[in-house]
Amino acid sequence: MPATLAVLSDIHANLPALEAVLADLDARLERGEVDAVYCLGDLVGYATWPNEVAALIRGRGIPTLAGNYDEGVGLNSDDCGCAYPTPDDEARGAESIGWTNGAVTAETRRYLRSLPRRLRITFEIPRRKSAEAIEILMVHGSPRRVNEYLFEDRPDASFVRMMEAAGADVMLFGHTHKPFHKALPSDDGRVRHAVNTGSVGKPKDGDPRAGYVLLTLDAERGKDDPGYCAARHVRVAYDVEAAARAVEASPLPDAFAAMLREAR
């Protein structure tokens, strides 16, 4: 039987977006459409509900990774490991992590510090008289660095080499806030799948709705068939204005509110 995993990432302290995604997932779980839920990190930063987001994810018992922002705040650092393109962006980023470090509770900081950098799942596939296993690797940025950006235009061969080195058939990651899925044939005959989940709380693809991915593994197919893994990117409407207005009412830069509205 196929199994479906829901994987979310990059919530970034946006509680209304997370609540909308969890409501969507609860309905799917009730209908038996989802078997498990995972989170790839970056719970905090840029918006106003870092403690509430961390508490909700933790309270749900969702297996969660540390994103680069979580690591920075977990260590009470002034560096989130982010790549800001301009001096103005860097200055706003410094304001964000400074405010977040002042806002989080000791309990939230301990939780962020406890999160692992990767999660590996072995999914067994009954096939003919033998059994194959799909190796699923979940990271925030890449297998090499928590803050490495893997964009869709990266050469396919680079993805394949990275996944071969990590022993992964399917790699799930976030960090760029831009969803995509690549099916990657390789020289050993198997097809590898690289899946960026997109972002729950701070999309950058022009669509302000919250995003996550449903990953379905088909037990009737082998790893030489691209169809053994299917990724469906889901978008969920939420009250973007409420999140943006909360940013504007806080000491955080107003630019972050515009980014929520414009998904950039």
Language model features: what each stretch is:
Residues 20-23, 52-55, 78-81, 152-153, ...:
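Short, glycine/charged-enriched secondary-structure capping and boundary segments
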Residues 183-264:
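Acidic, His/Gly-rich catalytic cores of divalent-metal-dependent hydrolytic chemistry
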Residues 53-54, 59-121, 133, 153-167:
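Active-site neighborhood of divalent metal-dependent phosphoester bond hydrolases
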Residues 8-9, 37-42, 63-68, 139, ...:
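Active-site neighborhood of phospho(di)ester-bond hydrolases with catalytic His/Asp-centered motifs
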Residues 1-60:
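N-terminal active-site segment of His-dependent metallophosphoesterases
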Residues 12-16, 45-48, 69-75, 120, ...:
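Active-site environment of divalent metal-dependent phosphoester hydrolases
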Residues 1-6, 121-137, 185-193, 226-229:
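Beta-strand-turn-beta hairpins that frame and shape the catalytic cleft
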Residues 32-33, 103-183, 264:
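His/acidic metal-ligating clusters that form di-metal
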